[in-house]
């Protein structure tokens, strides 16, 4: 039985009478006599022959195309024109109706919580402010899609091939601000608004920062950031001659202030601060500024006061609010440099206690990544002599360096793209086209928001920034793992080497294309982001599963969602080093937001464990940012509880379970259905099994944290390997030899396991000694060979060796 697919996707029985009726209307409209039954039936037979069917289903547009063609070929040209005119009129009516919002559905969908978008953003609670944001956002999104973007961009968004972020706001995305500029100028520059002179006291500055971030958040869609928070505040402590109690009171007012709902949707400003911990080299000799005036001392003279700021900040963040709930904002990012002092100090202990308990901070890896601490302040000062050079947007996952940021983000639905391609060649062709569309849409948005900036729609941004020339156009991606599953030329997830190689190839391909866009749209900047995809991962999968029932998602038996960016499936491994080895191939290739989240089931046992984990990662991996992310719960009566407890284990009252949703902590009950399913599927990392926390007794822990970082050398010299002051592990009959090569993440992971487990071993770098590799027939690294000739090959080599020599390892400890 022939069926018809209507424009809304519904399928109905075919009714030939409707074709006959439509044709008769066209004849009458032109005054042309309706043909007799014989002619009419012959025309209908020709129409049926022209209709394109698939699985006995015909598209409504195919029927109408066939009617037009038959009328014209039968000599009824005026009737055909009338039919085309009528068809276009109906199309215009449909489009006009589609552009008019169903206000009843919109409002009731929010009030009755029927629309999944009620939980689209976990920071927006069910409130009157949330309703107002929902209503205004729907209007603004229609404006972007109907009036600004071209039809292809709008249609690709509607089809979930791409996601245009922040359509609900006629504003740029995220920004990093120059805190020193605020210190020098105060809050002013906008006509008709109250102005404030530069702050002369720490308490005043803290209030100004709260006000400034709140003001700017209402002119931007995303995160607002300050850099060198502790460095710039320290001189105020010195000139005020504040004791610790006074410092803590000021910092407390700042933290509570930025957590007060003051932006659209009854949200707190989405804020990020970067803390230097030690005075940066490029600021050390600069004269400190207080009250807009240079002082007779430098920032480098204020290390003592800087420590007071850091101590106060961490203590308040660790104490949490009155019910033990961790503060959502600001998200702090700490700089881990080569000269970071890992010794047991009061502030180190506090920092890593906060990390172990709440997972609050992010850590910037300035040890092994391609970033430098000064980059956060130098972006706006660089001359772009090479248009193809890709810059990195510094400042943390949700932050940005001083006077830089992003004007917008467009994310590509990789699983849908792969699903619709028959071959790898077709994939590259369609990926290029999709990126072209994204780049053009971002170019359009930049022109729009720049015009609105000049028109005065963002008055404070105009006063403090002036232009968006140092702000990036950001292209993101989602569902790399499911892309590999749906790719007909792969068909395997990211735990397989073939898929990892393909993703690495894709990221490099995308980077090269971004360089092309920087030349084409010069002087605009482009970057590549591992999109957080809080709602996008769910929206993409939900849409795709409805449209393509056999497409593979991250969960085939529950609520569908896609894995964020190019992350491993959330339930893949409990070994943090397995995940790190894979992500170390991908994350350094992004030039915008990306982070490795170390998800833990509950708080780490002590601060030394957290410090050792962070140090191990930054010493041995190139990925730019890392977080330690324990799950915790909050009872209204008993406060903080380690781990996941939806009911308090003491009083059985309902408790809030907190975990990191994409980059920040929110109650799991506020997550959308897709992210809630991801939380259920998530396998947390067992750091004990990974070996990170072995020998964490008081003395051993202090030694592990207090030792300076071992510098990994490209020649992998044996002298740099044995970083142990305890008896090394040996095979029963001697020392094993590990054969590695340059730039091999699996080799690095194998060496790291040996170091942590105190294994004494030799290293041969096959990149420099191919003759030895050929002689021994070594075709894969890492390869570990015992003196008796036993071989352990591939990414599991170190684990296999440790298992085979378990008794020796136990004796050594």
Residue ranges and their predicted role:
Residues 1, 774-785:
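Structural micro-motif
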């Amino acid at each position: 039985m022939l069926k018809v697919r209507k424009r809304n996707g519904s399928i109905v029985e075919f009714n030939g009478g409707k074709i006959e009726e439509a044709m008769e209307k066209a004849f009458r409209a032109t005054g042309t006599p309706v043909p007799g039954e014989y002619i009419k039936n012959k025309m209908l037979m020709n129409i049926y022959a022209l209709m394109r069917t698939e699985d006995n289903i015909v598209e409504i547009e195919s029927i109408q195309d066939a009617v037009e063609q038959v009328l014209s070929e039968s000599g009824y040209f005026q009737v055909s024109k009338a039919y085309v005119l009528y068809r276009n009129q109906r199309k215009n009516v449909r489009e006009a109706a589609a552009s008019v919002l169903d206000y009843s559905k919109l409002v009731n969908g929010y009030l009755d919580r029927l629309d999944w978008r009620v939980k689209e953003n976990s920071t927006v609670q069910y409130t009157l402010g949330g309703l107002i944001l929902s209503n205004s956002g729907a209007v603004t999104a229609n404006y972007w899609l109907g009036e600004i973007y071209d039809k292809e961009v709008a249609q690709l968004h509607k089809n979930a091939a791409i996601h245009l972020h922040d359509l609900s706001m006629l504003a740029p995305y995220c920004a990093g601000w120059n805190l020193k500029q605020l210190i020098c100028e105060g809050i002013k520059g906008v006509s008709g608004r109250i102005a404030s002179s530069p702050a002369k006291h720490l308490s005043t500055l803290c209030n100004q920062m709260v006000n400034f971030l709140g003001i700017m958040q209402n002119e931007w869609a995303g995160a607002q950031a300050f850099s060198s928070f502790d460095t710039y505040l320290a001189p105020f402590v010195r000139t005020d001659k504040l004791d610790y109690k006074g410092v803590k009171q000021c910092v407390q007012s700042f933290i509570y202030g930025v957590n007060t709902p003051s932006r659209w949707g009854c949200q707190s400003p989405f804020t990020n601060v970067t803390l230097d911990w030690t005075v940066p080299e490029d600021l050390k000799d600069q004269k400190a500024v207080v009250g807009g005036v240079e002082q007779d001392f430098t920032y480098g003279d204020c290390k003592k006061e800087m420590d007071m700021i850091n101590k106060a900040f961490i203590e308040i963040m660790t104490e949490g609010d009155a019910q033990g709930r961790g503060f959502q904002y600001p998200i702090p990012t700490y700089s881990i440099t080569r000269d970071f002092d890992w010794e047991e100090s009061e502030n180190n202990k506090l920092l890593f206690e906060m990390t172990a308990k709440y997972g609050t901070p992010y850590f910037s890896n300035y040890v092994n990544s391609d970033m430098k601490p000064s980059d956060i302040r130098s972006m706006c000062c660089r001359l772009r002599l090479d248009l193809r050079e890709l810059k990195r947007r510094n400042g943390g996952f949700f932050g940005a360096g001083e006077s830089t940021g992003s004007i917008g983000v467009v994310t590509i639905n990789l699983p849908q793209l792969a699903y619709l391609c028959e071959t790898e060649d077709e994939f590259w062709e369609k990926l290029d086209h999709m990126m072209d569309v994204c780049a053009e849409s971002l170019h359009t948005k930049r022109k729009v928001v720049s015009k609105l900036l000049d028109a005065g729609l963002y008055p404070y941004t105009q006063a403090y920034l002036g232009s968006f020339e140092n702000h990036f156009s950001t292209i993101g991606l989602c569902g790399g793992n499911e892309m590999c599953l749906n790719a007909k030329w792969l068909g395997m997830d990211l735990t397989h080497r073939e898929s990892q190689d393909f993703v690495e190839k894709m990221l490099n391909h995308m980077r090269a294309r971004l360089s092309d866009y920087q030349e084409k749209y010069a002087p605009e900047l482009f970057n590549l982001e591992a999109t957080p995809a809080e709602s996008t991962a769910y929206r993409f999968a939900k849409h795709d599963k409805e449209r393509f029932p056999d497409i593979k998602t991250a969960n085939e038996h529950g609520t569908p969602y896609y894995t964020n960016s190019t992350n491993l499936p959330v339930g893949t491994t409990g070994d943090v080093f397995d995940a790190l080895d894979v992500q170390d191939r991908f994350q350094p290739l992004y030039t915008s937001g990306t982070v490795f989240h170390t998800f833990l089931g509950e708080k780490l046992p002590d601060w030394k464990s957290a410090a050792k984990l962070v140090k191990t990662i930054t010493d041995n991996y190139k990925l730019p940012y890392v977080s330690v992310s324990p799950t915790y719960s909050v009872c209204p009566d008993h406060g903080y509880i380690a781990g996941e407890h939806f009911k308090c284990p003491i009083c059985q009252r309902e408790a809030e379970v907190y975990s990191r949703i994409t980059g920040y902590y929110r109650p799991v009950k506020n997550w959308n259905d897709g992210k809630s399913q991801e939380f259920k599927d998530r396998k947390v990392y067992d750091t004990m099994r990974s070996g990170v926390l072995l020998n964490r007794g008081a003395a051993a822990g202090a030694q592990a944290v207090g030792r300076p970082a071992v510098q990994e050398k490209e020649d992998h010299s044996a002298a740099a390997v044995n970083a142990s002051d305890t008896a090394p592990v040996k095979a029963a009959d001697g020392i094993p030899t590990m054969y590695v090569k340059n730039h091999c993440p699996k080799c690095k992971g194998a060496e790291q396991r040996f170091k942590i487990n105190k294994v004494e071993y030799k290293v041969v770098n096959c990149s420099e000694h191919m003759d030895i590799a050929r002689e021994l027939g070594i075709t894969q690294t890492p390869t570990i060979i015992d003196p008796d000739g036993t071989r352990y090959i591939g990414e599991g080599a170190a684990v296999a060796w440790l298992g085979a020599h378990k008794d020796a390892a136990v004796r050594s400890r």
